Amino acid sequence: MRFLITAIICSLCAGCASTPKQAVTSIEIKEIKPRYFETEQFKRISEYMTGKEHVGERLILRTQPEHRAGYYFILVLDEDVRRLPIGTIVVGEFYTPKSLGKQTHEFTLPSLRASTDEIHIGLTGEDWPKIGGVPAAWRFTIKDANGAVLGEKQSYLWSL
């Protein structure tokens, strides 16, 4: 019995002493999937009962959080978003049908994040009033709180 108690205490101490994984210093954006989403595509059954949006295991960042319909870019990363450092910022730059100039939006990742390797970035509300159409070019840069670039990906047309 004494051996069992000692073994349990040792395993608890070892479990508490283990360190969590360190935040990443670089990340690869493996793929970006652009597509248009309607408001209804975000609704779940629980929202009808509670009245609050339930995002589940998704990380969704919008230019206008009160609007859901819009053009989204799903950034697929090579790491879980929880491994990104606190204060991580995603900078999105776009050429859209809305304006001739470049639009730039910064999104700060929340400190509490779902366990996923995808980030949904949405141009919503007035930032994307058209149901049809696609952005001409785009670039995403992921930076830490100090501004150091962790990863970047752009469309082919961005480089022209």
Where are these regions (language model features)?
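Short beta-strand elements
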Residues: 148-160
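A short, structured loop/turn motif at beta-sheet edges
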Residues: 98, 110-116, 144-148
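Sec-dependent bacterial lipoprotein signal peptides
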Residues: 1-16
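Bacterial Sec signal peptide processing site at the extreme N-terminus
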Residues: 14-32
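Internal, hydrophobic beta-strand segments that form the core of beta-sheet-rich folds
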Residues: 134-149
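Contiguous beta-strand segments within globular domains
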Residues: 45-80, 84-85, 118-125
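Mid-length scaffold segments of soluble, non-membrane domains
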Residues: 69-111
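Short, solvent-exposed, Trp/other aromatic-anchored flexible loops in extracytoplasmic proteins
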Residues: 110-135
